[in-house]
Amino acid sequence: MSPEDWLQAEMQGEIVALVHSHPGGLPWLSEADRRLQVQSDLPWWLVCRGTIHKFRCVPHLTGRRFEHGVTDCYTLFRDAYHLAGIEMPDFHREDDWWRNGQNLYLDNLEATGLYQVPLSAAQPGDVLLCCFGSSVPNHAAIYCGDGELLHHIPEQLSKRERYTDKWQRRTHSLWRHRAWRASAFTGIYNDLVAASTFV
């Protein structure tokens, strides 16, 4: 969208979303789309093959500050899946829920469309449940392929990291969404590239 078109739209009233199309393309935001969406701080609606795909504006997946229940490992998982076209529910979670007899991941994953798969069958977009300082799986990471994961742990920025022995030992199980298709990782990948080139 040219700056002139943007100004003309603003003169018509409040801009509440940006709508554009990918004729014959993929139903995910491109790298450039994600950079511009984050800059605009607006929902973007993408028309592709006769369907409207609505993307709320979420921060880039890497470089987020950790705040439990607001920007934590579940928020990262939820936002990554949103960019891949799969909506996950948001739910209240108290800090240290795993120390208070709760098992939020195992109690909710199947009900939200995920099923367990063998670790040997891992593919990009699968969700790794890990035990982080706990015997209860209390940490989610997105497997990116090529021995890499995307996650967010306390007191660190969200990041991509090697899936080393340390994380393999902490891994409880691997999960895949019933609506997942391999091409959906494109939505996540495009954000990772956009964030790495964001100036």
Curated annotation (Swiss-Prot):
One annotated GO molecular function is: cysteine-type peptidase activity
Q: Could you tell me the gene encoding this protein?
A: K
Domain (NlpC/P60): give its ranges.
40-186
Domain named MPN: residues: 1-77
Compartment(s): Host cytoplasm
- Quote the cellular component terms of the Gene Ontology held in the record: host cell cytoplasm
For the biological process aspect of GO, one term held by this record is: symbiont-mediated cytolysis of host cell
Motif location (JAMM motif)?
20-33
Q: What does this protein do?
A: Plays a role in tail tip complex assembly. The tail tip complex is assembled successively with three tail tip proteins J, one tail tip protein I, one tail tip protein L and one tail tip protein K. The tail tip complex interacts with tail measure protein to initiate tail tube assembly. The formation of the tail tip complex is completed by the addition of tail tip protein M, which is followed by tail tube polymerization. May be excluded form tail tip during maturation and would be absent from virions. May be involved in tail measure protein processing.
Which cysteine pairs are covalently linked by disulfides here? none
Designated name of the protein: Tail tip assembly protein K
Q: Where does Zn(2+) bind?
A: 20, 22, 33
Q: What is its EC number?
A: 3.4.-.-
